[in-house]
Amino acid sequence: MRTQRFITIVCLLLWTVAHLHAYEKRNLLQKEADFEKVKSALIMGQKWVPYPDYSDRAGWDKFLGDYKEDYIRKGECFLDYEWKIVKATDYLEYGRSGSRTIMESPFGKNNSALGSLFMAEMAEGKGRFIDQIINGVFVSCEMTSWALSAHLGLQKIGGCFPSNEEHVIDLGSGNLASQLSWIYYYLKPSFDKVNPLISKRLRHELQVRILDTYM
């Protein structure tokens, strides 16, 4: 009985090995999407952007319609906003008590304020909100990580404290990076009039934290 079972197992192993050797790597996606096809599918020069240029005031008036004044009024509420600092203990609290709110609350308030200021500037287009947007961008760039404390366990070192040697892409960092990317796209010329180092720093942070990490 044991001999018969042994022979059966050997036969199954041989059958498996034979089929493994016979397996053909098809690479269907790689064959279908060669370099030329991918190149022809790419939309270069930001031609895919569906929104008006910053200087196209008529375009933004049409795009925002009756909501234009609402966006401006909302942004005005943050002209004197005091940017929140996410403290080291705010991150550590997730490991101590399991509370993620203490870190996410100031982080979320900053992101919301920055978004409101950005949309107000896009709606008005007079540069009135630029300095405060720069403040928000600077606060974001100075953060060690854009990821939420509850997701920092994805770091190789683990834990809930942000490492400056490794970046994590989660919903928090992805959402903020998306917002900062639009800010860079539309307001880089305005930033450069104030100081070119502002947009240079923002571009660097997006590259290192998101693009390099993803790639």
Tell me what each language-model feature is.
Residues 23-95:
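Low-complexity, Ser/Thr/Pro/Gly-enriched N-terminal "stalk/linker" regions
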Residues 1-25:
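Bacterial Sec-dependent N-terminal signal peptides
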Residues 93-96, 148-150:
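Generic structural "secondary-structure junction" signal
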Residues 18-19, 71, 179, 206:
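Generic hydrophobic/packing signal
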Residues 57-58, 64, 104-215:
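Aromatic-lined, polymer-binding surfaces characteristic
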